[in-house]
Structure formats: structure tokens, C-alpha cells
Amino acid sequence: VSTMREVLKTLHDHYKYPVDIEFTINFSENGEFLINLLQCRPLQSKGTGIAGVKIPEVPEEKMFMKLFKNTMGGPTKMEFHTVVIVDAKGYAEMPYKENFSVANAIHAVNTYAGQNKKSLMILGPGRWGTNSAELGIPVRYAQISNVNAIFEMSFESSGLMPELSFGSHFFQDLVETNTFYGAVFEKDSSEGVKSIYRPQVLENEKEVYDEIPDTIKALRNILKVYELEESRMVLVADSKWEETVCWKEKENPKSSK
């Protein structure tokens, strides 16, 4: 696994895009192996057709996140009405079988966003689209089909780590629908510049989980669904410099100071 991860990273660095590969492995009697790369195709996302996106200077108190590399889908500028955060600690502590109910609750939020024409961002621990709930959130693509941006977050103490499965049907669906993808690491830094993640900027926004049909009440402390009313969440990604910034542009007048 570590060898293939290194191969994919090396190819990504040279192509400047994630890649889809076909390969064979031949093993010798002493356990050594040789990897033969048969095909390598760059998986280029479309972006939104914005040329020359410029990352703005954003005051830290307004910043939701700032990422360096670990994204797919730029150059782009997007705005969001609804933001969903799956609490990493709460999810990790759930009994294994109950993890699958989180996917069902997210499906309900996805349906709500589609019916009400809400632009939707979701963030959760580990891998999205995994079949193994101990590795992340076991959603099918149909359950997040109205999502505009999806982020995987690390929660190292429970082994939940971002790892988009290049070549999977789930990944292909993200590419084909131009869904923006990003990975948020607890200890991430690039060339000495640390990434930023500040969910506290949403603390005073309206939570609407209980108002959404078909959600599961027992999960209301696991899923936080924020409806931005007077505020708006803006994301700008520059694929050339591999930098992404997301911030709350207008303060909600109902928020306490």
C-alpha cells in the first residue's frame, strides 16, 4: 500500500493532476515484487472556467479554512448556503453498525439541499465513499449527489485519515460532476505554511438539522447542519499555486459580537 501511495504521489506531482492507472505486479519467490505500469491517465477536473483566480487576503477571524495542495477542482470560486460538519470525535466513538445511519442522515440533508436549491458543502472524518465505516463515512454517491464541495478531515487518534480512492467509481463521479474535493489534515503544512481550519466561525449560524425531513434525531450531535442566512461562505481555489481559501464573507447581524 505504501509503495502504491508513493507511485501515485510521484505521478500526481509530475502530471499536476490525480491519475488513474492500470498496472500489474509480479512477485518473486523471495517475496520481492516488480510493478509494471500499463496505463496512466490524468484525471483533470473541469473547474468553473474561471481564468486567473486570485486568492484574496482574508482576515483570520473570518477564515473557515485555508489549504495548500490536497485539493481537486480548481480554478474556481463558489458560494455556499448550507454547510454540514460530521463531528469527528462523535463519529469515531459510535458503535460500528450505527456509522451507516450517518450516511442515511446525510442523504436526507442532500435531498433537502436539492429540493430547496441550496449549494452544499460537507466535511467529515476519514474517507467519503468507503465501504468500511471504520475508515470513514460509507455513503454512496447517490446520497451526496447535490453536494458542491466535499472535504475529508483527519482524526489521527482514531485512525481516520483522508485518502481519496483514485480510479474508484465514487472518485469518477466526483470528477464527472465537477464536485470540489479537499483534504484537511490536523498537522498539515506545506513548505512551512500551516493550513487553517476554524469551524468556530459557524458557531452563531442557524442550525437546521432538526428541521430537515427524514433525518435521525439521535444523530443531531454528530451532524451539524448550518444554514447561512445573512452570511455566505465563499471558496476560492487557485489550481496553479495549489492554494484554497474559504471564508464567511458577511457577518450575520443576528450573531453576537
For the regions a language model picked out, list residue spans one by one.
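Conserved divalent-metal-coordinating catalytic cores
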Residues: 1-257
